[in-house]
Amino acid sequence: DRDSCVDKSRCGKYGYYGQCDECCKKAGDRAGTCVYYKCKCNP
């Protein structure tokens, strides 16, 4: 789910992150981006 995406994500301070996207899509969201080293899912 969305929380596990954030917990597991390791990415750059800003920008697109493929694994984020995959995890977020499984959680039912459209895509994922990185904000301050954390994954954010976009509904």
Swiss-Prot record:
Gene Ontology molecular function terms on file: potassium channel inhibitor activity; toxin activity
InterPro entries, per database record: Ergtoxin, Scorpion_toxin-like_sf
GO cellular component: extracellular region
Tissue: Expressed by the venom gland.
UniProtKB keywords: Disulfide bond, Ion channel impairing toxin, Knottin, Neurotoxin, Potassium channel impairing toxin, Secreted, Toxin, Voltage-gated potassium channel impairing toxin
Keyword presence, Zinc-finger: no
Subcellular location: Secreted
PROSITE patterns associated with the record: ERGTX
Disulfide bonds: C5-C23, C11-C34, C20-C39, C24-C41
One Pfam family of this chain: Toxin_17
Record keyword ATP-binding present: no
Signal peptide start and end residues: none
Reported function: Reversibly blocks Kv11/ERG potassium channels.
Entry's free-text remark on domains: The presence of a 'disulfide through disulfide knot' structurally defines this protein as a knottin.
Family: Belongs to the ergtoxin family. Gamma-KTx 4 subfamily.
Protein name: Potassium channel toxin gamma-KTx 4.10
